[in-house]
Regions:
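Alpha/beta-hydrolase superfamily serine-hydrolase fold, recognizing
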Residues: 3-229
Length: 229
C-alpha cells in the first residue's frame, strides 16, 4: 500500500504481477483509524472486482512501507478479528492473504521510541481517550489473529527511522509462530547506507531491484507452500 509510489508499483507489474495501488487519506487530515477504514474498503473493492483483472485472487500479497507497512500489518490482523474490526470501525474485506511484504514498517506507536513524536499526529491528540488506545503497538493486537500469513520484512543500515521497529516486529512475529524472514541490508553490500524504504523509492536501482526480487521469491515460496498444504 502506497500513497503515490507509482514507480514501485510499476516495478512489481514489470515482473508479471497484477498490482492494485491503494491510496488512503493522509494525516493530519485523518488518523490511523480512518486510514485503516480506507484500506479495508479498498481491499473489499479488490475482492469484489478482482475477477475483472487477470489475477489470482487466491494468492494475494499485501505490501506497504513505513506507515503503510503499519497499515498493512494491522489490516492483516483486522481481517481475522471481528472484535478489532468493530473497535476500529472497519468493514470486513473477506479476503485471505498468502503473504505480507513489510518495508520498514512502523508498527509500534504507543511505545515507539523516535516514532512517539508522531503518535498524536497519526492517532489524534485524544488518542488516550479512544477505544483503540490499547492497540497502538502491534504486539497488543497480534493475538487477535488466528494465523498471520508468511511475512517478509526489509530494512537497511541507513534506515534510521524504522530499523529498530522492523527488527522488533520481526521478533514479535517469530515469538507468535508466524513464518517470517527479515533482510537488513548492511552498508557493505552496496558500499552505501541504504535509506529508509530504499526499495520503494529506488526500485530500478541495483539495491532496490535485488530487494524486490528477494521479496517476491519469498512470495513465490509462500504460494508453493500453500498449494502443498
Amino acid at each position: 500500500m502506497y500513497k503515490r509510489q507509482h514507480h514501485y508499483c510499476a516495478a512489481l507489474a514489470d515482473r508479471g504481477y497484477v498490482v492494485f495501488n491503494i491510496n488512503y487519506r493522509l494525516v493530519p487530515d485523518v488518523t490511523v483509524n480512518q486510514q485503516l477504514q480506507d484500506v479495508a474498503r479498498a481491499l473489499r473493492w479488490i475482492r469484489d472486482h478482482g475477477s475483472q483483472y487477470p489475477c489470482d485472487m487466491q494468492n494475494i500479497m499485501l505490501t506497504g512501507d513505513s506507515a503503510g507497512g503499519q497499515l498493512a500489518a494491522y489490516s492483516a490482523v483486522l481481517m481475522q478479528s471481528a472484535q478489532l474490526r468493530k473497535t476500529f470501525d472497519t468493514v470486513n474485506p473477506q479476503m485471505e492473504l498468502t503473504a505480507l511484504l513489510l518495508t520498514s514498517p512502523v508498527a509500534f506507536m504507543r511505545d515507539g521510541g523516535l516514532f512517539s513524536l508522531y503518535t498524536k499526529p497519526m492517532w489524534g491528540t485524544d488518542y488516550k481517550d479512544k477505544a483503540t488506545y490499547p492497540y497502538m503497538d502491534f504486539d497488543q493486537i497480534i493475538d487477535y489473529a488466528q494465523a498471520l500469513p508468511p511475512t517478509y520484512l526489509i530494512t537497511s543500515s541507513g534506515d534510521t527511522l524504522a530499523n529498530k521497529q522492523t527488527h522488533r516486529l520481526y521478533e514479535v512475529l517469530q515469538a507468535h509462530g508466524v513464518q517470517a524472514e527479515i533482510k537488513d541490508y548492511a552498508k557493505a553490500e552496496y558500499n552505501q547506507s541504504l535509506p529508509h524504504v530504499f526499495s520503494v523509492l529506488q526500485p530500478f536501482e541495483p539495491a532496490g531491484t535485488a530487494a524486490i526480487d528477494k521479496a517476491l521469491a519469498f512470495y513465490q515460496q509462500a504460494m508453493t507452500a500453500k498449494v502443498a498444504q
